[in-house]
């Protein structure tokens, strides 16, 4: 039975039991506690936790998941993988334990020809919470045990286990409860008798049924938590691993040999000439390739692009591990296009998006592989040298400084350094590396992690949200008379606040737009008791709740009547910029191609930036064409309409959705000129495109592998920008005394003349430098067994200093000579040391000598054995620096 068919049987079965089939959420689910969806219940968390009402009483899904915690174990064992599909059925206050067990038993044991999974009932074992582990279940989960017994499982195949095995929670405060796990006995060839308690290789878990009964107030460990009380509704949350069921039903030994994975191994074997099963190390690499290719495909399909932070870094690591594994299998040519295309065809039946997003996926993957191949060439050489140096010193640990240099200078990820060092029998000083990375982040991104505007944590917001959601009336009204329903001060919900406090106000309804979907928040005032409080920020910290950050200039209490007034000028500017964002998105898709999908955006009055998927930059002519297309759309004054409709209907009509965003069952579709621009959007817009005025494209740049960014000004800001450019052209034509259409040619000629003058000046400077060579060589003095050519060359620095040192060394190449020059400026002396081949053979290393030489001038230096440079800040030590090199040479 194919994997896709198993999944379809699961959801079909539960649909027949009154469950709504919910499509898989994106792997980039909007949950700040997770990088990726890592469990089937994640999209249902708000409903299970009670923070949002569930749209369904019963639901079922096939959820794609990614977990990379054990990425280093992937391939080494056949149990670990980074991508998997979780089957689940859920009940939100509807049916409970008995029905959940009955449904599971029916599906698992029903013959395959009747639509079930067809497992032999005699092979099924189950576990339940055992006696003595939980105060509410002193005799264990008797209800679950009785339900399984009624289903037909003999007592000896029902095992009671501890909280660690048969109690489930999310690891944080929230719902929890006992669970029951279903196991399949694979037979004595896989391990000893005795059920799951004896051996979990022979007895393989396929399904976990969680019976959520309790609200946990604190969680310290799997079996250490505090119970606040019972849940308001009893929930069912189950998860069954699709890949695990598939390999049992397909008669293979592990998930790597199933129909959705093994063909990738076969393709990698074909490309490398390495037969799977012939050699352990090759098998490990082939499994790494198969797993990571599928994970990378699914992540890129859902909108992740390779990068250096968070999700992008995980994807980059997966793709680079594939490339390196294939190199170790002997394949030096590009590999990702072929491997990804195989995985795409395997996954298309289950997830059609892998086909519609293919152009963007393959573009990002190809660009990343090209980049990494260059990184491998440069970084591997440096790492090899560092390994040799470390071993020569007798150490077993590669320095954290070297690992950091590899990462910072060559883009070599630390995990690759760890992996390659381990292959050479070395550890890496990870603590030092981590400290250096922390220092760099602190310097580069101070305060960047602070959440804008929010004054407390999510828990406090969730408590206020439980009182009711905040209706947004701002699509039609900019002024609303309303009531204060909540005040949050210093992280706590309060009933009143005094003047001088900065608080967050919750209103019964609001016209203020909260920052969301790339659109900046509204500004304005909240008028209370005759006093105007300026609204500093508006946020939506948890779904359904809008908070208004204000500085109180008077008293305010819950229950006060207030008037909320949005600033109409800034709102109109935000509407112009947001509609212009839709215009530029449509223009990009029309002129660049359908793969130019949105990867992020930000807009505020007068300005917008838009990130989109692309593997190369836009030409100047294409940028001009895009700007013109946008302004034609503005001139055509297309009507802007919005319509509420079911999410599935919106997708069916081609409405563009932002990857990773969570959308409710009913969505708002904003259209410009019908199908030309049709997007899911909750933002505010002008009534027609003509009200944008105009758009001026500022520029375009890369913001990460596979992602480009355009920036633009709109309305009066665009007019001012163009007026400033016109004034600049007028000024330049006046200075250069040419007509505007002659300006480019005139500037080009001036640039060419300047380049030629610089070339001549450089040639003259080189002749002058080389004219000193004879005099400097004539001043050669002995230093032990070496000839020391030392001189001061004031004003000579950088490449000129290197050129002079190299020329002098060439003159004395037949001798064991060391060239030492000090130049630079008066307050910043620069030093260089160069050695001949025979000098190096006798023990004179430029890299070691420079460290001795720069000390007297208060500097630092480094380099290779043949040439090294340094610089300092103390010119009084120049003579001492030259003497120090002489002394060091004499001692060799």
Curated annotation (Swiss-Prot):
<protein>
    <recommendedName>
        <fullName>Alanine--tRNA ligase</fullName>
        <ecNumber>6.1.1.7</ecNumber>
    </recommendedName>
</protein>
<dbReference type="InterPro" id="IPR050058">
    <property type="entry name" value="Ala-tRNA_ligase"/>
</dbReference>
<dbReference type="GO" id="GO:0005829">
    <property type="term" value="C:cytosol"/>
</dbReference>
<dbReference type="InterPro" id="IPR018165">
    <property type="entry name" value="Ala-tRNA-synth_IIc_core"/>
</dbReference>
<dbReference type="GO" id="GO:0004813">
    <property type="term" value="F:alanine-tRNA ligase activity"/>
</dbReference>
<keyword id="KW-0067">ATP-binding</keyword>
<dbReference type="GO" id="GO:0000049">
    <property type="term" value="F:tRNA binding"/>
</dbReference>
<dbReference type="InterPro" id="IPR045864">
    <property type="entry name" value="aa-tRNA-synth_II/BPL/LPL"/>
</dbReference>
<keyword id="KW-0547">Nucleotide-binding</keyword>
<feature type="binding site">
    <location>
        <position position="582"/>
    </location>
    <ligand>
        <name>Zn(2+)</name>
    </ligand>
</feature>
<dbReference type="InterPro" id="IPR018162">
    <property type="entry name" value="Ala-tRNA-ligase_IIc_anticod-bd"/>
</dbReference>
<dbReference type="GO" id="GO:0005524">
    <property type="term" value="F:ATP binding"/>
</dbReference>
<dbReference type="InterPro" id="IPR012947">
    <property type="entry name" value="tRNA_SAD"/>
</dbReference>
<keyword id="KW-0648">Protein biosynthesis</keyword>
<dbReference type="InterPro" id="IPR002318">
    <property type="entry name" value="Ala-tRNA-lgiase_IIc"/>
</dbReference>
<dbReference type="InterPro" id="IPR018164">
    <property type="entry name" value="Ala-tRNA-synth_IIc_N"/>
</dbReference>
<keyword id="KW-0694">RNA-binding</keyword>
<keyword id="KW-0436">Ligase</keyword>
<dbReference type="GO" id="GO:0006419">
    <property type="term" value="P:alanyl-tRNA aminoacylation"/>
</dbReference>
<dbReference type="InterPro" id="IPR003156">
    <property type="entry name" value="DHHA1_dom"/>
</dbReference>
<keyword id="KW-0479">Metal-binding</keyword>
<dbReference type="Pfam" id="PF01411">
    <property type="entry name" value="tRNA-synt_2c"/>
</dbReference>
<comment type="similarity">
    <text>Belongs to the class-II aminoacyl-tRNA synthetase family.</text>
</comment>
<dbReference type="Pfam" id="PF07973">
    <property type="entry name" value="tRNA_SAD"/>
</dbReference>
<keyword id="KW-0862">Zinc</keyword>
<keyword id="KW-0820">tRNA-binding</keyword>
<comment type="function">
    <text>Catalyzes the attachment of alanine to tRNA(Ala) in a two-step reaction: alanine is first activated by ATP to form Ala-AMP and then transferred to the acceptor end of tRNA(Ala). Also edits incorrectly charged Ser-tRNA(Ala) and Gly-tRNA(Ala) via its editing domain.</text>
</comment>
<dbReference type="InterPro" id="IPR009000">
    <property type="entry name" value="Transl_B-barrel_sf"/>
</dbReference>
<feature type="binding site">
    <location>
        <position position="685"/>
    </location>
    <ligand>
        <name>Zn(2+)</name>
    </ligand>
</feature>
<dbReference type="InterPro" id="IPR018163">
    <property type="entry name" value="Thr/Ala-tRNA-synth_IIc_edit"/>
</dbReference>
<dbReference type="GO" id="GO:0002161">
    <property type="term" value="F:aminoacyl-tRNA deacylase activity"/>
</dbReference>
<keyword id="KW-0030">Aminoacyl-tRNA synthetase</keyword>
<dbReference type="GO" id="GO:0008270">
    <property type="term" value="F:zinc ion binding"/>
</dbReference>
<dbReference type="InterPro" id="IPR023033">
    <property type="entry name" value="Ala_tRNA_ligase_euk/bac"/>
</dbReference>
<feature type="binding site">
    <location>
        <position position="578"/>
    </location>
    <ligand>
        <name>Zn(2+)</name>
    </ligand>
</feature>
<dbReference type="Pfam" id="PF02272">
    <property type="entry name" value="DHHA1"/>
</dbReference>
<keyword id="KW-0963">Cytoplasm</keyword>
<feature type="binding site">
    <location>
        <position position="681"/>
    </location>
    <ligand>
        <name>Zn(2+)</name>
    </ligand>
</feature>
């Amino acid at each position: 039975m194919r994997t896709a068919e198993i999944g379809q049987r699961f959801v079909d079965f539960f649909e027949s039991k009154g469950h709504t089939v919910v499509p898989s959420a994106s792997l980039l689910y909007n949950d700040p506690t997770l990088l990726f969806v890592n469990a089937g219940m994640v999209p249902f968390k708000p409903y299970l936790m009670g923070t949002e009402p569930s749209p369904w009483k019963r639901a079922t899904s096939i959820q794609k998941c990614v977990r990379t915690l054990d990425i280093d174990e992937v391939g080494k064992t056949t149990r670990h993988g980074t991508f998997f599909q979780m089957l689940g059925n859920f009940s939100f206050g509807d049916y409970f334990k008995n029905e959940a067990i009955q449904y599971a038993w029916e599906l698992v044991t029903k013959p395959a020809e009747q639509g079930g999974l067809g497992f032999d009932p005699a092979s099924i074992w189950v576990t339940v919470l055992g006696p003595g582990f939980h105060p509410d279940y002193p005799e264990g989960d008797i209800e679950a045990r009785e339900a399984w017994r009624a289903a037909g499982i003999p007592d000896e195949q029902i095992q009671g286990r501890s909280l660690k095995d048969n109690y489930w929670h999310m690891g944080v405060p929230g719902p929890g409860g006992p669970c029951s796990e279903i196991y399949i006995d694979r037979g004595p060839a896989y391990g000893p008798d005795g059920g799951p308690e004896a051996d979990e290789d022979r007895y393989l878990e396929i399904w976990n049924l969680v019976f959520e009964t309790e609200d946990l107030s604190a969680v310290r460990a799997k079996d250490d938590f505090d119970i606040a009380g019972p849940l308001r509704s009893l929930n069912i949350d189950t998860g069954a691993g699709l890949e695990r069921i598939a390999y049992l039903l397909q008669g293979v030994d592990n998930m790597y040999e199933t129909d959705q994975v093994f063909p990738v191994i076969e393709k990698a074997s074909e490309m490398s000439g390495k037969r799977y099963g012939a050699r352990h190390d090759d098998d490990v690499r082939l499994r790494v390739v198969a797993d990571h290719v599928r994970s990378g495909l699914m992540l890129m399909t859902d909108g992740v692009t390779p990068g250096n932070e968070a999700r992008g870094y995980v994807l980059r690591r997966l793709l680079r591990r594939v490339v390196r594994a294939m190199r170790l299998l002997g394949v030096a040519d590009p590999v990702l296009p072929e491997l990804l295309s195989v995985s795409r065809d395997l996954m298309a039946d289950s997830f059609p998006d892998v086909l519609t997003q293919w152009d963007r996926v393959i573009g990002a993957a190809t660009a990343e592989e090209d980049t990494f191949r260059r990184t491998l060439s440069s970084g591997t050489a440096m790492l090899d040298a560092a390994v040799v140096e470390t071993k020569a010193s007798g150490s077993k640990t590669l320095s954290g400084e070297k690992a950091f240099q590899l990462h910072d200078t060559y883009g070599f990820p630390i995990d690759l350094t760890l992996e390659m060092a381990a292959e050479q029998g070395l550890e890496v000083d990870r603590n030092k590396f981590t400290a250096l990375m922390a220092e760099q982040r602190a310097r580069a991104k101070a305060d960047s992690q602070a959440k804008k505007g929010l004054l407390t944590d999510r828990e406090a917001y969730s408590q206020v949200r439980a009182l009711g959601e905040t209706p947004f009336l701002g699509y039609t009204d900019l002024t609303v008379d309303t009531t204060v329903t909540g005040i949050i001060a210093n992280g706590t919900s309060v009933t009143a606040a005094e003047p001088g406090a900065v608080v967050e106000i919750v209103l019964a309804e609001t016209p203020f737009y909260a920052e969301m979907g790339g659109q900046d928040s509204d500004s304005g005032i909240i008028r209370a008791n005759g006093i105007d409080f300026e609204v500093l920020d508006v946020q939506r910290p948890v779904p359904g709740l809008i908070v208004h950050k204000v500085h109180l200039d008077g008293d305010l209490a819950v229950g006060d009547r207030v008037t909320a007034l949005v600033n109409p000028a800034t709102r109109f500017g935000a509407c112009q910029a947001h509609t212009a964002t839709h215009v530029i998105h449509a223009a990009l898709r029309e002129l660049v191609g359908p793969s130019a999908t949105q990867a992020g955006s930000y807009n505020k009055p007068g300005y917008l930036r838009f990130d989109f998927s692309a593997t190369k930059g836009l030409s100047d002519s294409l940028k001009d064409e895009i700007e013109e297309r946008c302004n034609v759309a503005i001139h055509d004054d297309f009507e802007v309409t919005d319509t509420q409709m079911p999410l599935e209907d919106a997708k069916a009509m081609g409405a563009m959705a932002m990857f990773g965003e969570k959308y409710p069952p009913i969505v708002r579709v904003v259209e410009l000129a019908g199908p030309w621009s049709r997007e899911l959007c909750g933002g505010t817009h002008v009534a027609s495109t003509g009200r944008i005025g105009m758009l001026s494209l500022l520029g375009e740049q890369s913001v990460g592998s596979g992602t480009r960014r355009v920036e633009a000004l709109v309305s009066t800001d665009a007019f001012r920008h163009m007026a400033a450019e016109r004034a600049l052209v007028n000024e330049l034509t006046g200075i250069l005394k040419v007509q505007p259409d002659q300006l480019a040619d005139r500037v080009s000629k001036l640039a060419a003349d300047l380049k030629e003058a610089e070339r001549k000046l450089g040639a003259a400077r080189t002749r002058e430098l080389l004219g000193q060579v004879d005099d400097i060589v004539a001043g050669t003095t002995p230093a032990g067994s070496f000839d020391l050519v030392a001189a001061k060359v004031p004003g000579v620095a950088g490449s000129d200093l290197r050129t002079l040192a190299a020329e002098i060394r060439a003159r004395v190449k037949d001798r064991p000579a060391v060239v030492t020059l000090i130049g630079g400026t008066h307050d910043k002396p620069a030093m260089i040391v160069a050695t001949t081949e025979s000098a190096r053979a006798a023990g004179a290393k430029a890299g070691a000598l420079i460290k001795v030489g720069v000390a007297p001038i208060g500097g630092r230096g480094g380099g290779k054995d043949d040439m090294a440079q340094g610089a300092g800040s103390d010119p009084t030590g120049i003579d001492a620096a030259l003497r120090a090199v002489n002394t060091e040479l004499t001692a060799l």
